[in-house]
Swiss-Prot record:
Family classification: Belongs to the peptidase M20A family.
Active-site residues from the entry: D71, E125 (proton acceptor)
Taxonomy of the source species: Bacteria, Bacillati, Actinomycetota, Actinomycetes, Mycobacteriales
Keyword line: Amino-acid biosynthesis, Cobalt, Diaminopimelate biosynthesis, Hydrolase, Lysine biosynthesis, Metal-binding, Zinc
GO MF terms held by the record: acetylornithine deacetylase activity; metal ion binding; succinyl-diaminopimelate desuccinylase activity
Catalysed conversion reaction: N-succinyl-(2S,6S)-2,6-diaminopimelate + H2O = (2S,6S)-2,6-diaminopimelate + succinate
Sequence positions that bind Zn(2+) 2: D95, E126, H330
Organism: Mycobacterium tuberculosis (strain CDC 1551 / Oshkosh)
Name of the encoding gene: dapE
Pfam families, sorted: M20_dimer, Peptidase_M20
GO biological process: diaminopimelate biosynthetic process; L-arginine biosynthetic process; lysine biosynthetic process via diaminopimelate
Cofactor mode of binding and number, as noted: Binds 2 Zn(2+) or Co(2+) ions per subunit.
Protein name (record): Putative succinyl-diaminopimelate desuccinylase DapE
Length: 354
């Protein structure tokens, strides 16, 4: 059985050594559930698919939700775990079994927390959003996600990262007239027309937005270009896929309108293919403010999209905070500094009390 009350570094290693690729989390969920039932007193514990949920009912004035996903990307020859000096190596070491270990250890060792606690260990975060276990819990058990602040244990190198950017993908398509390239004047080259789109992107200046002391830098980038029929054909169609990462003060609708404004006047068709709203940091809320104080005021904006957006949609302030370097997530040499693990335990113990 997992030892939740022992060394959280050893607990991290034990979690890493349980393979848990997305959709194959049954074993790790079984282990987590059994350990919580045996070692975390005062929690109501339930199972939802391959997700494990636990909560206290201490009638505290505020509730803190700790959320972590149990799944990892496919193993890349990086199991079992191994310790080298101050680094713990293995699949999921940073993303995010070290964060899970911190939450599990605290659940079993906090005697008198000053907040009520909810823990959500969920499945299928690393694959398509439609399969995400947190989304399923939101649909099937919405009362379990009620909280005054949520902490998602994604790797942040031990710094609190508030909110997250939104993301929007669109395809800009242009049309022309097909012709033999030997008689190019009879055609209208669609690929050439993309030049005007790329020119707009080349001179675009992304904005930076300060929200609750966090600076969110936006980005509007071409990520794919498609076109061409054959080596002797003037193409009659071409497209460029654009990804807009926008600050959380903009809605998806406002982000889409901004893209239309940027390319206004060009003869292009704009089709939205994917979008997810960002999450405001909400650091002015009392429960979130206390967390920032426990961290000594060290907080920064989160770049990229994470599940904190799901909490923001519910009106719950949410932050990312966990051990490990996010740049090492999904790498063959994924690892976490063991000092990050103990530091996260210490900080959250100060914040949660007990």
């Amino acid at each position: 059985m997992l030892d939740l009350r022992g060394d959280p570094i050893e607990l991290t290693a034990a979690l890493i050594d349980i393979p848990s690729e997305s959709r194959k989390e049954a074993r790790i969920a079984d282990e987590v559930e059994a350990a919580l039932r045996a070692q975390a007193s005062g929690f109501e514990i339930i199972r939802n698919g391959n997700a494990v949920l636990a909560r206290t009912k201490l009638n505290r004035s505020s509730r803190v939700l700790l959320a972590g996903h149990l799944d990892t990307v496919p193993v890349a020859g990086n199991l079992p775990s191994r310790r080298e000096n101050d680094q713990l190596h293995g699949c999921g070491a940073a993303d995010m079994k070290s964060g899970d270990a911190v939450f599990l250890h605290l659940a079993a060792t906090l005697a008198e927390p000053t907040h009520d606690l909810t823990l959500v260990f969920y499945d299928c975060e690393e694959i398509d959003s439609a399969a995400n276990g947190l989304g399923r819990i939101q649909r099937e058990l919405p009362d379990w996600l009620s909280a005054d602040v949520a902490i998602l244990g994604e790797p942040t190198a031990g710094c609190i990262e508030a909110g997250c950017q939104g993301t929007l993908r669109v395809v800009l398509s242009v049309t022309g007239t097909r012709a033999h390239s030997a008689r190019s004047w009879l055609g209208d080259n669609a690929i050439h027309k993309l030049g005007a789109v790329l020119d707009r992107l080349a001179v675009y200046r992304a904005r930076s937005v300060d929200i609750d002391g966090c600076t969110y830098r936006e980005g509007l980038s071409a990520v794919r270009v498609a076109g061409g029929v054959a080596g002797n054909v003037i193409p009659d169609a071409a497209s460029v896929t654009i990804n807009y990462r926008f600050a959380p003060d903009r809605s998806v609708a406002a982000a889409l309108q901004h893209v239309h404004d940027v390319f206004d006047g060009l003869d292009v068709q704009i089709e939205q293919t994917d979008a997810a709203a960002g999450a405001l940091p909400g650091l002015s809320e009392p429960a979130a403010k206390a967390l920032v104080e426990a961290a000594g005021g060290q907080v920064r904006a989160k770049y990229g999209w994470t599940d904190v957006s799901r909490f923001a949609a519910l009106g719950i302030p949410a932050v990312n905070y966990g051990p490990g370097d996010p740049n090492l997530a999904h790498c063959r040499d994924e690892r976490v500094p063991v000092g990050n693990i103990t530091a996260a335990v210490d900080l959250l113990r100060r914040y949660l009390g007990g």
